[in-house]
Amino acid sequence: MATTGNWQSTSCILCSVNCGLQVQVEDGHFKKIKGDKTNPGSKGYTCEKPASLDRYQNHADRITSPLRRREDGSFESIDWDTAIREISGKLAHIRDTHGGSKILYYGGGGQGNHLGGAYSAATRRALEMRYSSNALAQEKTGEFWVERQMFQARPEPDFEHAEVSVFVGKNPWQSHGFERARVVLKAIAKDPNRGMIVMDPRRTETADLADVFLQVKPGTDAFVLAA
């Protein structure tokens, strides 16, 4: 990629909030990364994760080709055609011997582009798979179910204006929060007319800002909520 000093607008893909970013690219590397103040959602805010994007993309230890395990447990690099041929052959053998229902497809798109999940359709069809799953099955299905029971829809939480905010097993100060999470959390903590309740086995950065912190034992959160 040619050297450029111009700021380019884009968005972060490291969580579902997708904060707006501005980046400078030089010779295929991110030279500078900052929050995009013109983004109507994040308004220039970012957490620390985007600052590491160049390290993720260009780290010396990044795996750039398939690795095949040797008998001694070490790995050797192989080309993509070989990897696809060997893996597809083994999967086809499982299908022919035990049936496609014995193969579980797990995967999908990234946080910034979920179209990758659709690419699995041809593979699942060819292998006669019946079952599939992804990270949302663990992370979000319970949340979606509760929202449907309470609101008959999936509302977007308005923590910026809420009088009372409740976080159960969630630390938006660090990850997977909401737009301008740290700015909003600090504003809630400083406002005597607003409250924050955190329920978590671990005392997190968000818990340190809370008016009420319930440090429950793992597995007991449902009982606390029921009470």
Model-predicted segments: where are they?
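N-terminal export/assembly segments and adjacent metallocofactor-ligating motifs
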Residues: M1-A227
